[in-house]
């Protein structure tokens, strides 16, 4: 089983953590933007199957 030979430096660890946090923030921002677009009705690139109403079920 491979084992790291040296301890990872604090600078490298913090840099990796900062990159990870940046990616997480970007994903959160995208999710909020998409959510806002859906709620405000500005979404054009999404496909939603229409909910079946009671009239459609009777046919």
UniProtKB/Swiss-Prot annotation:
Domain of life: Bacteria
GO molecular function, one term: structural constituent of ribosome
Taxonomic classification: Bacteria, Bacillati, Cyanobacteriota, Cyanophyceae, Synechococcales
Keyword Nuclease among record annotations: no
Pfam families: Ribosomal_L32p
Protein name in UniProt: Large ribosomal subunit protein bL32
One GO process term, biological-process aspect: translation
Signal peptide extent: none
InterPro entries in UniProt: Ribosomal_bL32
CC per GO annotation: large ribosomal subunit
